[in-house]
A protein has these predicted regions:
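Non-catalytic terminal/interface segments that mediate subunit docking, oligomerization
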Residues: 17, 22, 30-31, 368-472, ...
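Short beta-alpha connecting loops at secondary-structure transitions
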Residues: 67, 169-171, 226-234, 249-258, ...
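A mid-to-C-terminal "edge-of-domain" accessory segment
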Residues: 4-5, 11, 246-248, 252-419, ...
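Catalytic alpha/beta core domains of metabolic enzymes, predominantly
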Residues: 175, 182-305
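Alpha/beta enzyme core
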Residues: 5-7, 17-42, 55-64, 78-199, ...
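Short, small-residue-enriched loops and turns at beta-alpha junctions
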Residues: 14, 18-19, 47-52, 103-105, ...
């Protein structure tokens, strides 16, 4: 019988630490439900003590999903654990993920402590967490740069204290695969009682080795992997769930299995990309748009004769459907709801009605509606509780003349109008906006992304605005790229005028 590899998804915790990728609670629930359908074993739902938003998200996700274990992150601090316990009170299966830094640099500079004291704090945290839950995971932060002998002492102590999972993070993404694999093997061979806990990997991609290190860990005895959808995460990201799942599925000689329904990988990838406003690079393994594209004549000829000549993965195995349905203005609510369900998106009736209204408006402006358009519609409406909303926008522009824009805003129910000229339509529109919103804001980043193909398709705009020495990220989506730009700017403003 094959060994079981447990999939611990941290998209909603580590993945959400990417600047500009923060989700609201409704969106987090949407992702959590998709992860449940995908088949992940553990969902790390947040760091409850870090913010009221994270605390509430853990509570609501615990209510929304049934069979995955819901995990809450803490430091090795009693107050953190108390808050995590409270946040997990509705979870059917619950886990506390507590830990402390173990490398010499963390011990000396972060904690101003010593090795023995760190072990004492680690043991105390695990014992305290075990008073409330049966499933406690311990992380040895910066284990990648912790010497193996001391790391083994820490891990042995926390297992004796009751840890059920021991997480060995390559926090800085520094380890070579051979080095990381040897570290896991050292723990397997030298930690008394290691058979009483599951060894987990948690690898970062700073040097592009997250997936390789994770596989090295698996091959040397790790039986849980901590991953994110699309490899999203802090700095250069984390190990990508889709890569590990398909490596395990493709290499039968490893004799390990997961619970992942691989046909849900691609829809989940697209949904997370859309909700987090984080495009997937074209050449990304498994889920990039070029992952199964062949431009070389020799490759094309081989694939036409037999796909196995150059394709080691069947696109259908990851949920890529060549015959995806194209919706039109004549498509009804049921067709839209069904397509959203296939894409991993579940909406309540009120939200579905709003999305359907926007769908009909979009269908009037363009002939065919594709999956990416639908995902944008399902994730783009964040204006419900916004204080500032765009009422109208009119722009006059041409070659050799300055652009002129006039717009109207609704600010907490009060109407405002302004006009301005500028060097191009976007510049004019933003200058008009600034005449109403009299704040000193600096546009730091402005990115336009085409969602699908065709001149009438939806465009997404991502903006980064600096205000009062803080960075705010905004998003807009519209078939009119000028309107999308204004929506993105307003989205930024709403972040600091709550």
């Amino acid at each position: 019988m094959s060994d079981r590899l447990f999939i611990f998804d941290t998209t909603l915790r580590d993945g959400e630490q990417v600047p500009g990728c923060q989700l609201n609670t409704v969106e987090k629930i949407q992702v959590a439900k998709a992860l449940e359908v995908l088949g992940v074993d553990v969902i790390e739902a947040g760091f409850p003590i870090s913010s009221p938003g994270d605390f509430n998200s853990v509570i609501e996700i615990s209510k929304a999903v049934t069979w995955p274990t819901i995990c809450a992150l803490t430091r090795a601090v009693q107050k953190d654990i108390d808050v995590a316990v409270d946040a997990l009170k509705f979870a059917k299966h619950k886990r506390i993920h507590t830990g402390i830094g173990t490398s010499d640099s963390h011990i000396k500079y972060k904690f101003n402590s010593n090795r023995e004291e760190i072990i004492e704090r680690a043991v105390a945290a695990v014992k305290y967490a075990r008073r409330f839950v049966d499933d406690v995971e311990f992380y040895a932060e910066d284990a990648g740069r912790t010497d193996n002998e001391y790391l083994a002492r820490v891990i042995e102590a926390v297992i004796r204290a009751g840890a059920t999972v021991v997480n060995i993070p390559d926090t800085t993404g520094y380890c070579l695969p051979s080095e990381y694999g040897a570290k896991i093997k050292y723990l397997v061979d030298h930690v008394a009682g290691i058979e009483n806990a599951i060894i987990s990997t948690h690898c970062h991609n700073d040097l592009g080795m997250a997936t390789a290190n994770t596989m090295a860990g698996i091959l040397n005895g790790a039986r849980q992997v901590e991953v994110t959808i699309n490899g999203i995460g802090e700095r250069a990201g984390n190990t990508a769930l889709e890569e590990i799942a398909m490596i395990i599925k493709s290499h039968h000689e490893i004799d390990i299995e997961t619970n992942i329904n691989t046909q849900k990988i691609y829809p989940t990838s697209r949904m997370v990309s859309s909700l987090m406003n984080m495009p997937v690079q074209a050449n990304k393994a498994i889920v990039g748009r070029n992952a199964f594209a062949h431009s070389s004549g020799i490759h094309q000829d081989g694939v036409l004769k037999n796909v196995q000549t150059y394709e080691i993965i069947d696109p259908h195995d990851v949920g890529i459907d060549d015959n995806s349905i194209v919706l039109t203005a004549r498509s009804g609510r049921a067709a839209l709801k069904n397509r959203l369900s296939i894409l991993g998106v579940t909406l309540d009736q009120e939200k579905l009605d709003k999305v359907y209204e926007e769908f009909l408006k979009l269908a009037d402006r363009k002939k065919d509606i594709h999956d990416d358009d639908i995902l944008v519609l399902a994730g783009a409406d964040r204006s419900g509780n916004h204080r500032i909303k765009l009422e109208y926008l009119q722009v006059t522009s041409g070659v050799g003349v300055r652009s002129v824009a006039s717009l109207g805003l609704n600010i907490a129910g009060e109407k405002f109008e302004a006009a301005a000229s500028g060097n191009g339509p976007v510049d004019a529109a933003i200058k008009a906006l600034k005449r109403i919103i009299d704040r000193h804001m600096t546009l730091k980043e402005f990115t336009i992304q085409a969602i699908s193909k065709g001149s009438d398709d939806v465009g997404k705009v991502h903006m980064q605005v600096e205000y009062d020495n803080q960075m705010y990220y905004g998003f807009g989506a519209n078939t009119d790229i000028i309107a999308a730009s204004v929506e993105a700017y307003i989205d930024c403003i709403n972040k600091f005028t709550k």
